[in-house]
UniProtKB/Swiss-Prot annotation:
Lineage: Bacteria, Pseudomonadati, Pseudomonadota, Gammaproteobacteria, Pseudomonadales
Record key words, sorted: Amino-acid biosynthesis, ATP-binding, Cytoplasm, Glycosyltransferase, Histidine biosynthesis, Nucleotide-binding, Transferase
Molecular function GO terms recorded: ATP binding; ATP phosphoribosyltransferase activity
Catalytic activity: 1-(5-phospho-beta-D-ribosyl)-ATP + diphosphate = 5-phospho-alpha-D-ribose 1-diphosphate + ATP
Organism: Pseudomonas savastanoi pv. phaseolicola (strain 1448A / Race 6)
Pathway: Amino-acid biosynthesis; L-histidine biosynthesis; L-histidine from 5-phospho-alpha-D-ribose 1-diphosphate: step 1/9
Protein name listed in UniProt: ATP phosphoribosyltransferase
Length: 211
């Protein structure tokens, strides 16, 4: 049995056509089904529907053989048991700092609100900047508006939400897209099967990119 971990939303919607190129099609619509384990048209392949931030954990610990996760999630993840063989070039966005429009950055210790705590620590450590990191799980845009933080670090797509709340994107930390991740043990035990899937997905990505 080959188990693939996916999260609902944009990543799932963009991944399903790529899996279809490999003949893997869910037997139920994952967006409408309440099932978290969904069979596919290949009897020995199933999909696990999990939270986006949990995909690397399921894959590293062998609960799933493969998964699709955003590079932002993988940058924040601290585990070691994953291969990252393929950039699927889907769900593209940017991981950026943002602050109030026209605000002057303080010269002293900077307060940064984000759910990407590990990313923030590395980013500012590389700059040699002293920061206090405040972990939030949502509504990041509020933090600079009410004085909780000087800046935020968050995923930015169009930037419309930032601008609607009086913020502006500032420094680019990383360009984000979704990646295929593979459990290291699964890659050894089911190498031929998984490598064939990787090759098929790579061709599908290249074909889509050319068009």
């Amino acid at each position: 049995m080959l188990t693939i971990a996916l999260s609902k939303g944009r990543i799932l919607d963009d991944t399903l056509p790529l899996l279809a190129e490999a003949g893997i099609v869910p037997t139920e619509n994952p967006d409408k089904s309440r099932k978290l384990i969904i069979p596919t048209t290949q009897a020995d392949v199933r999909l696990l529907i999990v939270r986006a931030t949990d995909v690397p954990t399921y894959v590293e610990h062998g609960a799933a053989d493969l998964g699709v996760a955003g590079k932002d999630v993988l940058m924040e993840y601290t585990g070691q048991g994953l291969y990252e063989p393929l950039d699927l070039q889907i769900a593209k966005c940017k991981l950026m700092t943002a602050g109030a429009i026209g605000a002057v950055e303080p010269k002293g210790r900077l307060r940064v609100a984000t759910k990407f705590v590990n990313v923030a620590k590395r980013y500012y450590a590389e700059q040699g900047r002293q920061v206090d990191i405040i972990k939030l799980y949502g509504s990041m845009e509020l933090a600079p508006l009410i004085g909780l933080a000087d800046k935020i670090i968050d995923v930015v797509d169009t930037g419309n939400t930032l601008r609607a709340n009086g913020l502006e994107p500032q420094e680019l930390i990383a360009t984000i897209s979704s990646r295929l991740v593979v459990n290291k043990a699964s890659m050894k035990m089911q190498h031929a099967r998984i490598q064939a899937l990787i090759d098929t997905l790579r061709k599908a990505v290249e074909s889509r990119h050319r068009s």
